[in-house]
Structures are given as structure tokens and as C-alpha cells.
Regions:
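Structured, charged N-terminal subsegments at the starts of enzyme catalytic cores
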Residues: 84-129
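Hydrophobic or amphipathic alpha-helical targeting/insertion segments
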Residues: 152-153, 176
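Short, flexible/disordered intra-domain loops and linkers
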Residues: 258, 375-386
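Long amphipathic alpha-helix in the N-terminal Rossmann-like dinucleotide-binding domain
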Residues: 66-69, 110-114, 121, 132-147, ...
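Rossmann-like NAD(P) dinucleotide-binding subdomain of oxidoreductase/dehydrogenase enzymes
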Residues: 187-347
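C-terminal segments
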Residues: 2-83, 163-164, 168-193, 211, ...
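Short, well-ordered beta-strand elements within core beta-sheets of diverse protein domains
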Residues: 99-104, 118-125, 201, 221, ...
């Protein structure tokens, strides 16, 4: 339901707590930036923002204070002053059935673009070190309100609280800091100035002083998604901002609040640091407005970051010719099972990946390819049906108790997922049916357990496209060799963000790795413990590769940031 209003005044944004001197910010965050720069080079474990919501980490009142701050937004007008606001829009509907009713200021495209363009020159002239430090200060400010943000993520996406806190808060902030570090590294790849002297025979040498300016491309447009509004949006937002571009944030209509909070604190810090807060603006859309498409085709918009459907991602790539377009779309994530020395651990690990957030992660496995003659395990050879039953049984155990299940599954993000579960039942033999769960805390929440289907490799058309949601297929193949062929064929055409293999045979592991190199997808081998295929760690793991149809870029590498700015030089005789 959309509400648009033109009466009433926006609640004022709070006055700046204190002015921030840019030089002091550079000094304040120098150590953090240096550690982040080192982390992206080393690729070992490093995290700047603690992932545990424990009171021992964040303080005894942090959780309650954050929830209270979140609740002040409900049923009211979000406190965000932006240029040219002409009305109010409210489009969110919580998967938990909680009434949100938050209204956001709506501005026309022309006003947003004009304000963003005017804000850029001073931001450009501040230079890489200042921009990087201000971006880290924004992340620090958001982190001060991380419980407020986590509640917003939970109630707009359907994630259970711990996941909403971790993925929507510290993990998203780490991914943002990672992109800032890459931006800092790329902007500093060339010196700011150079003295040039060329011998000229018997005459005086030719001498010039040269200056190399990092120049932004233009306006960056970030188009948010419903499921991970911060985690998927922060890398592009902060990569563009750090490299000198203004950013317009267009949230998904069902998940506006997390990005509205983000924009609020970004604007607050920018203003305190002496910059135009219109460097970061929110562009919520009214129902049917299609403001993302309008913005994406504006000549001033030079960068587009998008996470969502293949159909719309393809449209952006094919139509926003004036911009560099970074997309993450759909794929068919696959597990190849050949053999294992820990069958119970394998089943438990796969089950957790299938259950977490009801399979609504872009990295969740869908197809599990198993030889129809079975596999070798630590207890001997077992048949295909026993493998399938082991995985299905592990999922059933995870979701057997409703109160515990909802802390893993969360809620279903939209009606399309519920419809898809119903449609999928006719696409195979049901090994484990999806069931409706009554949430003990939120009676109107929409909760469904995973659906697991049995299929045969002869019916490839049943499982060769993405079925987004808690839907997976255990597929009987003629052999591991055929499993690899199917993997290459489907992922080579449709793409994937993750792949996994289970085998005690080094030659099989090598063959699977070769296959993943050919189709450009990241591989995890023999996961049986506390690492899961659908999770990735900032500063170490790359999310997506940009090497297959599921995404045209990676989070995060140098290529993700280097095309967001240009080097423009000037030279003078000395």
C-alpha cells in the first residue's frame, strides 16, 4: 500500500553535535584505513566492526536504545531534510506482519540530480585522503546506531534478529570499509604531483611541474534490494562516494528504512565536516513511479549499482549506456557430491545453508548433484536415496521446533516466494515438504520451512533456472563426471555466485576447481564445520566474480572501484 501526502512539515534533522575538522578526521581514521589497506592485500582474517550483539561488546543498554530509536520512526515521517521534497511516500510492509507506516520525503528527479551535481566540486577538491576519512567517519557514525539499523533490517527484510544485526550491520559495514580501502588504494596508485625534467642536449633541461587530479565520473545511482538492503548497497555507495561522486540511493520499496537511516547519518557527517549533505540523497519511489529507470538513463548518472532480478539487471546493462553499470543478478548455485569422510557433518552443513533465511540469500545452494549409484563415506558406500534422506533429515531436524526454526528461517520476504514454493512442488518428488510455521513472537509473520525435491538428470529443464526461496533439488546423475558436465552447462549459461563440492578424491576436487574456473564461480570444498557456502568474509572472500551471468562485478576488487573516477592532469613549466 502506498500513501502520498503533501501536507505538513518534515521533522527537522538534529543539529550537528559538533563541527568536524577534516584534518582531524584524517588523523583519527589513519590507523583504520592503513589496516584496511593491508587487509585487502593480505586476504587474511580482519574485521573492524564486532559481529556479536552481546552487551559485553556494545554495552548493557545498546540493544534497548537501538530498538527504541527504531520504534520512534514507526507510523511517522522520517526526519530527513532533502531539497525539493514535494510529498511523502510509504510503501513498506513487514514480513513479520508488524505495522511500519514510515513515510519518506519524495523529491522529483530533476531536483535530486541538480542538487547532487552542485555538491560535487568541493567534494572532488577535498582529495582522496579527506574523502576516505569522511567515509570512514560515516561508517563509524552508522555503527554507533547499529542496533537501530539492525531492527530496521529485521522488520523490512524478514531476517531473524541476529542475522539482521550481523549481515545488516557489522558485515555490511566491513564490506563498505573494504570498498573504501580499495578506492583509497586505487586513488593513491598515482602520485598527486610530479617534477619532470628531460635533458635537452647542451641547453637547459626541460622542466615541468605536473599535477594529477582524481576526478569523479558524475552521479552514482545505488538501487537497493529487498533482502539485503545494506549489505548489497554499501559497497557501491561508499566506493562511489570515496572516489568523489555524489550518490543517489534508490531503496527497494519494501526495504526503505535501513537505507533511509544510512542516508540520514551520512548527510549528518557530511554537513559536520563542511561538505554539502546533498552528496548523499534518498530517492524513495511512489507506487508505479519507476524512478530507478528514470534516474538510470539520466546523462548526469555515470555509475549504477544494482542488486536484483536478472530481467531488470539486463535492462540496465542494455540501456544505461552513459554509465558504468555494476549488477548482481540471479544464478543457479550448485553442490556436487562425490564422496565424504564426514557424512553427518556434510548433511548438517548443507542443511544449515538451505535453511538460513529461508533460502533467500543470493548465495544459497539450489541444486545438489549426487551419483544415482551413491557415494563412499567414512562408514562405507551408501545409496542415492540415503544421501538425499540424510540432507532432508538434517533440514527437518533444524526446523522441527518452531521457536528454534524461526531464528534460522526468519520470514518470507514477499508473496512471490510463497507462490514459488507452491509451484515448485510439481517439479519433482517431494523429499521434504515446506510447511507453514506460526511465529511465537509475531503471529502475522509469513514463515515457511524449506522444500526439498528429488529429481533426475534427465529432467534438467526442471532445475536449470533459479528458484528463489527455500527450494532445492537433490538430483540423481549417472556419475560425478556427469554432475560436472551439468554444473558446467547450467552455470555456464545461467551463472552462479557459489559452488561447493564434497569429495575425498583429490582428482575430483581438482576437476571441480577446473570447472569453476571455466565458468567463473567461487568454490568451497568439503565444508562440514562452522563455515558455510552461502557466507563470505569481507577483506578475504570475494563475493561474486564478475566472470559469469550472475554478476558482472565482484565485491570487492580493484576493478569495482577504479572505473568510478578518472585521472586528469595539468602541467606547467618550471
Amino acid at each position: 500500500m502506498t500513501a502520498t501526502h503533501t501536507d505538513g512539515a518534515v521533522a527537522s534533522e538534529p543539529a550537528p553535535r559538533h563541527p568536524l575538522a577534516v584534518a582531524s578526521l584524517i588523523e583519527k581514521h589513519a590507523a583504520t584505513i592503513a589496516k584496511a589497506d593491508a587487509a585487502i592485500a593480505d586476504r587474511g582474517y580482519w574485521s573492524h566492526f564486532p559481529e556479536s550483539p552481546s552487551p559485553k561488546v556494545y554495552g548493557e543498554t545498546a540493544a534497548a536504545d537501538g530498538q527504541a530509536a527504531f520504534e520512534t520512526y514507526l507510523g511517522g515521517r522520517f526526519p530527513l531534510e532533502q531539497p525539493g521534497a514535494t510529498g511523502w511516500v510509504a510503501t513498506e510492509r513487514s514480513p513479520f506482519g508488524v505495522a511500519l507506516g514510515v513515510e519518506y520525503p519524495h523529491s522529483d528527479v530533476e531536483t535530486l540530480v541538480t542538487a547532487a551535481t552542485a555538491a560535487m566540486p568541493a567534494w572532488r577538491d577535498a582529495g582522496p585522503d579527506a574523502r576516505t576519512a569522511v567515509c570512514v567517519e560515516i561508517l563509524t557514525r552508522i555503527h554507533e546506531h547499529v542496533f537501530e539499523l539492525a531492527n530496521a533490517v529485521q522488520f523490512t527484510t524478514g531476517q531473524a534478529f541476529v542475522m539482521a544485526f550481523q549481515a545488516g550491520g557489522p558485515h555490511a559495514l566491513d564490506r563498505a570499509l573494504e570498498s573504501v580501502a580499495y578506492a583509497h588504494t586505487e586513488m593513491k596508485r598515482h602520485p598527486a604531483t610530479a617534477d619532470w625534467e628531460k635533458p635537452a642536449g647542451k641547453g637547459d633541461p626541460l622542466r615541468m611541474s605536473k599535477t594529477f587530479h582524481v576526478v569523479p565520473r558524475g552521479i552514482g545511482l545505488v538501487i537497493g534490494c529487498n533482502t539485503f538492503p545494506t549489505w548489497n548497497s554499501y559497497p557501491g555507495l561508499f566506493a562511489s562516494l570515496a572516489t568523489g561522486n555524489a550518490v543517489i540511493v534508490k531503496p527497494h520499496p519494501l526495504a526503505v528504512l535501513p537505507l533511509a537511516i544510512t542516508v540520514k547519518y551520512a548527510r549528518e557527517v557530511l554537513a559536520e565536516a563542511g561538505f554539502d549533505p546533498d552528496l548523499v540523497q534518498l530517492a524513495p519511489e511512489a507506487e508505479g513511479e519507476k524512478i530507478a529507470s528514470t534516474l538510470a538513463l539520466r546523462p548526469e548518472v555515470k555509475i549504477v549499482d544494482f542488486t536484483g532480478s536478472t530481467q531488470y539487471g539486463d535492462w540496465l546493462e542494455q540501456n544505461a549506456h552513459q554509465a558504468s553499470v555494476y549488477t548482481e543478478k540471479a544464478g543457479v548455485n550448485t553442490i556436487v557430491v562425490d564422496s565424504t569422510d564426514d557424512f553427518v557433518g556434510m548433511c548438517r552443513n548443507v542443511a544449515f545453508s538451505l535453511t538460513l533465511y529461508s533460502g533467500q540469500m543470493c548465495t544459497t545452494p539450489q541444486n545438489i548433484l549426487v551419483p544415482r549409484d551413491g557415494i563412499d563415506t567414512e562408514s562405507g558406500h551408501i545409496g542415492f536415496d540415503e544421501v538425499a534422506a540424510g540432507i532432508a533429515g538434517a533440514v527437518a531436524k533444524l526446523v522441527g521446533d518452531d521457536a528454534r526454526a524461526v531464528e534460522l528461517t526468519g520470514a518470507i520476504v514477499n508473496d512471490g516466494v510463497v507462490s514459488r514454493i507452491g509451484a515448485a512442488r510439481s517439479h519433482g518428488e517431494v523429499l521434504l515438504d515446506s510447511r507453514e510455521v506460526k511465529h511465537p513472537e509475531f503471529p502475522d509473520a509469513v514463515v515457511r520451512t524449506p522444500l526439498i525435491l528429488k529429481q533426475d538428470s534427465a529432467n534438467e529443464g526442471m532445475f536449470d533456472s533459479e528458484w528463489f526461496g527455500p527450494i532445492s533439488f537433490v538430483v540423481a546423475t549417472d556419475s560425478t563426471a556427469q554432475s560436472l558436465e551439468i554444473f558446467r552447462r547450467i552455470v555456464g549459461k545461467k551463472g552462479a555466485l557459489t559452488a561447493a563440492v564434497y569429495s575425498t578424491d583429490e582428482s575430483v576436487l581438482d576437476a571441480m576447481e577446473d570447472a569453476t574456473l571455466d565458468v567463473g564461480v567461487h568454490l568451497s570444498c568439503n565444508l562440514t564445520g562452522g563455515v558455510f557456502v552461502n557466507q563470505s568474509a569481507a577483506f578475504s572472500d570475494f563475493h561474486a566474480s564478475g566472470a559469469n551471468a550472475a554478476a558482472n562485478s565482484a565485491l570487492t576488487d580493484g576493478a569495482y572501484v577504479s572505473n568510478r573516477f578518472r585521472i586528469v592532469q595539468s602541467r606547467r613549466h618550471v
